[in-house]
Amino acid sequence: PSIAAIGSENTESTSESMCAVVKGYPLVIRNSDSPEKQWGIPFDAPLFYWYREEDKERQLITYMEQTFSIQPSETKKAVLAGNDAMRQFGSRLKEAGAKVLEEVEKEGRYAVVLASRPYQNDALVNHSLPELLTEFGVPVLTADSVPGIENVDLSHSRLDVVNNYHARMLASAVLAAQSQNLEYVQFVSFGCGHDAYLSDEIQRMMREISGKSPLILKLDESEVQGPLRIRVRSFLETINMRRKKREMAERLQNQPGTSRQENAGGGNECGTAALGPDIQKSWQVHELSDPYSVKFEVEDRKKRTVLVPNTSHAFCRIMSAALKTQGIRAVPLAVGREEAIRLGKQYVHNDICFPAQIVIGEALAALRSGQYVPSETAIGMGKYIGDCRLTHYSALLRKALNDAGYPEVAILTNDDVDYHDLHPGFRMNLMSAIRLAGALPMIDILEELLRKIRPYEKVSGSSDQAFDEAMDFVVDGLEQHGFSGALRGFKKAIQRMNAIEYDRSQPRPRVLIIGEYLLNFHPGANHEIERYLEKNGFEIIEARM
């Protein structure tokens, strides 16, 4: 089955999406193994949306009745029994986790939280890591066995929590950072892009709460027992050394006649200062601060220039025009190429999708140019709440800006809810959305005309010049008079494109370009594949945006 949505099990109401990769597994199996064709075995791949328990019951009753002629009353009994079994299992798991935690606290030891996806419970996937840890004498807890995990406040995470497994990993990281008796290990397999932003955020949260560092392991099908043992042993030795220093510091602080102030340094080489600042920090647990402390306020509409990265340059221009209709000083960025890619690779996790790297790289390249004052600049970034990594571009951008030395740059998105309060001074309104929706088909048509004409133009470069002028008509009309202005501009744009001289008497072979959304339309990201193919004798067909 493909389960697209499931109810939240934590404090975040948005954590209803299921993994986009896992949702596609039935299609992968059907196309790769073809059980119907190869063995004549029926292959069912029903699609379910279980936002509530009632949804699950209703959809399963319908599926079982239509597919297997099972009576609704029988299916309802089975669903209730399954729910009861899951509740009992969850209770036993929490009890076992509480027992382990109680024991290590009593004995002054520590346990390790193994944060992973469900498939990483398989010994073939995790390379028997749980057994390796217990071999070293360290108890192991799964994230969902940690007591209180469902009640952890995740509002100060940079991420929008859209998945229950993400919530488990983040919440268990918070609890591990807050406890002297818990440490943290995260599994990552096949360079999962969703785990990439989780790894970044887990490290940030744990470091800010108590100075702890997690162990992040990338485990795939290759033989890793030797390197894995070394990594785990090094991690445990680091923890043991830190705990010994902590015990020494506590003994020094508790010595009769020795004040806390003396132990904080003050020339006393035997004080806790001699143990290092990282150890001193680990004594204290801090509340997470606002991860987006720099806001786009109302006054920033006049103060800040908003830089808009590209999907396609045409879309970037109409997005900027739509923002201008709401009083935003929006500037469409030039299409990023090698420098943008380099900066994106440098400041964005390399396991995240390439589109995130290129659009963030474009913003960083613009800031590096010296053309914009950081304190008077904001970056406009696309966003929606769901299972695509686009949900987390603003979090990736915030980290990249901070790491690159631009913490004063604000972020603005098209998210009308703005859960993290990035831009209290701006909400994209319905009229702007309507203007964008109306302008999108216009640029689709203009780009399609460009692709039909450019390979056959009589004057080299005339098609690109006409397209730029045609876009000016649409953008200026949208900016000055909204949708009606864009429509009038579009009519002029069509006339301008029709004025190009071309000869299609000898049609070229046509090539369809298909791929990841941004790579299709972004010439810097796809290394000008359209022009390359046109120079080599082809006409391009492109999916419409």
Each predicted region: which residue ranges?
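An N-terminal assembly and electron-transfer interface module characteristic of large anaerobic redox
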Residues: 1-545
